[in-house]
Amino acid sequence: TRAMLAEKRGDLPGLEQDLRNIIEREPDNAAALNALGYTLADRTTRYAEAKALIEKAYQLDPEDPATLDSLGWVNYRLGNLAEAERYLRQALEKYPDHEVAAHLGEVLWAQGKQREARKVWAGALEAQPDSTILRGTLLRLTGSEKL
């Protein structure tokens, strides 16, 4: 879709507009609500708006691991670390993905749980050793791409 192409090009305004157009036509499209909410949480400081979109997606599909990850990430951005950890653990349990593991590890790290964060990252790196997301998170937080 155009929204995905806009994301690949780094066109945040285009991505946002395309997702808003989808939501306008399909107000209960949980995937579009979550995609827009996550994008805002990850790439802007519009956290309240992001959280409202993600929470609507969650109400529509509370079992979706991508939405659980987004809820965790937006709560992290808002400083709600315990809440962020809870959602990210649920997401990782349902979908053991390298990006979710990077997010959970970062939240654990921010809470001073470095040993636990490293354990989460190690498990994810074992499954996906070429993950640039995990390596980038490690480098940013620990100063090294290696555990």
What are these regions (language model features)?
Residues 25-26, 60, 93-95, 127:
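Structural marker of alpha-solenoid helical repeat scaffolds
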Residues 32, 67, 100-101, 134:
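TPR alpha-solenoid repeat register
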Residues 1, 8, 42-43, 77, ...:
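Register position in tetratricopeptide repeats
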